[in-house]
Amino acid sequence: QHKAMQEKMKLAASAFQSQQKKLTMKTDITTAVGNGWQLHHGDCVRVIREIESESIDFSVFSPPFADLFTYSNDLQDMGNCSDMEEFMGHFGILIDELFRVMKEGRIVAVHCVDLLSTMSKHGKIEFQDFSGEIKNAFRARGFLFHCPITIWKSPVTEMQRTKAHGLLYKTLKSDSCKSRVGCADYLLAFRKPGENQEPVTKDPNKYPVDWWQEVASPVWMTVDQGRVLNKDGARDNNDERHICPLQLDVIERAVELWSNPGDLVYSPFTGIGSEGVGALTLDRRFIGSELKESYFNQARQNLANAKAQLTLF
């Protein structure tokens, strides 16, 4: 009976949303090109199918978090899926193409967080294993699970931002069986099988043992959560959620660890250009795609500015 009620609520919500938003589908691809970078405005699957096989040296990105956020009203937007199963079906198409375009022996790094279900939407409160779903999807399509990295985040900041019941001190006092720990971020690294024909080498003068010991830690404790690109210019009047750019510390560590200077770095979900700025700053090349126009415009500006600033010094 409760399940039937949930389905009715879900259908009602979908009907309401369809009245409020006119769904669109962008089928063309427009391209911006700069010094060392290309940015494509269009659906990531359409874009990646135009990329040459085994041409990408490293890929790093943060995908839409299943059905958690609504980013645009485009039918191709993976954030518009109704549930985890539908999202993973669409995401799997992209993973197939990622396997094709990646060079052998090279790495794809995926940023994610496990999602908390809610009573209003799911009828229960528990963590959904989003990171596990991503691992299964990549492994099912031929990738090897290279390593997981946990990114520490402050539970106090999470509590203040979300007012999550499980993090409140009053919950601890009233019934600590309802208390939980804070949510970490994850960077999941996957490797395409085969021999890497261009080893990623490190100069010990630039990368001393201290650097390696910090990066080799299974938990990155020193990521500055506030070090992100300025997102204000990418907002549009129809945004339902706040934009949350990936931390530059995470991007830069991954780019330095798993690619060489001059390598081609790819992000299918460029957003406002964080991965591209990180790649260009570290003397890599970048190719990306972004479906939402306001994000694309901001990313194009950020990429151009990043390269311009480098040429000044």
List where the protein language model places each region.
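C-terminal alpha-helix
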Residues: K8, N302-A306
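Asp-based, Mg2+/Mn2+-dependent phosphohydrolase catalytic module
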Residues: G288, A308-F313
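Core catalytic lobe of class I
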Residues: K26-Q298, A304
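A conserved SF2-helicase RecA2
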Residues: Q1-T24
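Acidic, low-complexity intrinsically disordered tails
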Residues: L23-K26, T311-F313
